[in-house]
Amino acid sequence: MIFNNLKNQNKIINFLIIFYFLSFLKQIESQSINITSSSSSWQCRGDLVYRNVSNRIEDEKIGFNFVQYNGTYQSCVIPCPSPFFTINEWNKFLNMSLVMGTISFFSGLFLLVTYSPIVNKTHNRHTIGVMCMSFGVCLAMCSDMWNFGSNFTEKSICPSPGQYLSTSNARCLSSGIFLQFGGVFGFLNWTLLSFDLFMNIKGIITKNYDKYYVSGTFIIAIIFTFVPIVNDQYSMSYIGLGCWLGSAMYQLIFFWILLSICLIVSSVFIILILKEVYIIIKLSKQKTSLKGNIRPLICISITGFAFFYMFFYYISIVVEGDYYERVLNEYTDCLMDPTKDISECKSPRMSVASEFVFLLCLRLLGIGAFIFYGINNKVKKIWLNSYWFNNSFVEKYISRKSADNDKSNSNGSKVLYRTNNTNNNGSFNTGLESSIIEMSTNSNKEESSLNSVDEI
């Protein structure tokens, strides 16, 4: 019995020893974590973010950019967003992109619906070109929709502090594909529009190659969009608000070279168009051709300016790439140097105005196209001839409204509509036509314009 008591006491003593030993190890581990945390906090000064460098290669694949100091990678990464702009400036860029991108998206969507078979009954090179360009604009502007509800102070676009979006992120990949495909498809069809405008002014009639135009531009856009995925090229850059082609080489091959070719070709057509317009003004009193084409001419010119600005801004960034890389390295070296005070470290900066205009140009394309292709008598005529304004429900509503207006204006001081049963074209319902015409101060002029030759 005595031996049994001793055995029980030994078990208790052993348990207490083990418990004390485990508590001691836990205390040492806690102190070690505190020391490591304190060390990492001291090491990653300023806006640098701590990240253990032991798994650097895998971390770089998911968007972390590690800092080098004295030729060695450190456990610190570049902050996201980058220090090239302040947080306040980044938020201004983001707010502008959300507002202008949304307006541009719905502008492009209106044109897409208007010129599509959903509304438009007849098609030619011009309407197909506008429809395809609008489709590209809508896709490109969709990339901004991913940023709704985000900013750089509370719910950041960056997945985590110091982490940039990369191909491994589904949101990044999808928005990058939309932006790339929409951009390529949009400016290819914009180039075809300049060609179509030149052919129209010259009065040249060619065979119907619409199917080849659409198929060719679509295939090119598909190739230039999905080939970069093979090497995981869609990512967020130091100066971007979202994902696009990450490598400068891929940007050059799969976007800027093609864009420069389109710019050269379209510029030639624009010069030829201006020449023809000058001849029309100088030698002919007929203003029909000039009046019908001046609106799309301005649209193409403004769009060309936007593309040219984006192209030359990109070239300037590439040319000065070594400079920006050097100032960023100098900034991180200063932060990593324990002998220097943080106040001595000068943050790398880029031109806020130039970046703002660059981000704005792409988002103006849909708005510009809407102004010059969506606000004219041609669009009104398309909608008036469409099913949406020629069905039993609308006719009943318009007829009732027209009858009420006739009754309230029976003194004859104002005529809201005229019945025309002899119109060979049979283009519009009278009640619907009068409802639109009453918005104009001159009904005769409006009706005449609706039955005139289609504008481009």
Curated annotation (Swiss-Prot):
<feature type="topological domain" description="Extracellular">
    <location>
        <begin position="31"/>
        <end position="92"/>
    </location>
</feature>
<feature type="topological domain" description="Extracellular">
    <location>
        <begin position="149"/>
        <end position="174"/>
    </location>
</feature>
<feature type="transmembrane region" description="Helical; Name=4">
    <location>
        <begin position="212"/>
        <end position="232"/>
    </location>
</feature>
<feature type="topological domain" description="Cytoplasmic">
    <location>
        <begin position="196"/>
        <end position="211"/>
    </location>
</feature>
<keyword id="KW-0732">Signal</keyword>
<feature type="signal peptide">
    <location>
        <begin position="1"/>
        <end position="30"/>
    </location>
</feature>
<feature type="topological domain" description="Cytoplasmic">
    <location>
        <begin position="274"/>
        <end position="297"/>
    </location>
</feature>
<feature type="glycosylation site" description="N-linked (GlcNAc...) asparagine">
    <location>
        <position position="151"/>
    </location>
</feature>
<feature type="topological domain" description="Cytoplasmic">
    <location>
        <begin position="114"/>
        <end position="127"/>
    </location>
</feature>
<feature type="region of interest" description="Disordered">
    <location>
        <begin position="403"/>
        <end position="422"/>
    </location>
</feature>
<feature type="glycosylation site" description="N-linked (GlcNAc...) asparagine">
    <location>
        <position position="70"/>
    </location>
</feature>
<feature type="glycosylation site" description="N-linked (GlcNAc...) asparagine">
    <location>
        <position position="34"/>
    </location>
</feature>
<feature type="transmembrane region" description="Helical; Name=6">
    <location>
        <begin position="298"/>
        <end position="318"/>
    </location>
</feature>
<comment type="similarity">
    <text>Belongs to the G-protein coupled receptor Fz/Smo family.</text>
</comment>
<feature type="topological domain" description="Extracellular">
    <location>
        <begin position="319"/>
        <end position="354"/>
    </location>
</feature>
<keyword id="KW-0675">Receptor</keyword>
<feature type="glycosylation site" description="N-linked (GlcNAc...) asparagine">
    <location>
        <position position="52"/>
    </location>
</feature>
<feature type="transmembrane region" description="Helical; Name=5">
    <location>
        <begin position="253"/>
        <end position="273"/>
    </location>
</feature>
<feature type="transmembrane region" description="Helical; Name=3">
    <location>
        <begin position="175"/>
        <end position="195"/>
    </location>
</feature>
<feature type="transmembrane region" description="Helical; Name=7">
    <location>
        <begin position="355"/>
        <end position="375"/>
    </location>
</feature>
<protein>
    <recommendedName>
        <fullName>Frizzled/smoothened-like sans CRD protein F</fullName>
    </recommendedName>
</protein>
<feature type="transmembrane region" description="Helical; Name=1">
    <location>
        <begin position="93"/>
        <end position="113"/>
    </location>
</feature>
<feature type="topological domain" description="Cytoplasmic">
    <location>
        <begin position="376"/>
        <end position="456"/>
    </location>
</feature>
<feature type="transmembrane region" description="Helical; Name=2">
    <location>
        <begin position="128"/>
        <end position="148"/>
    </location>
</feature>
<dbReference type="InterPro" id="IPR050949">
    <property type="entry name" value="GPCR_Fz/Smo-like"/>
</dbReference>
<dbReference type="GO" id="GO:0016020">
    <property type="term" value="C:membrane"/>
</dbReference>
<feature type="topological domain" description="Extracellular">
    <location>
        <begin position="233"/>
        <end position="252"/>
    </location>
</feature>
<keyword id="KW-1133">Transmembrane helix</keyword>
<keyword id="KW-0325">Glycoprotein</keyword>
<keyword id="KW-0472">Membrane</keyword>
<keyword id="KW-0812">Transmembrane</keyword>
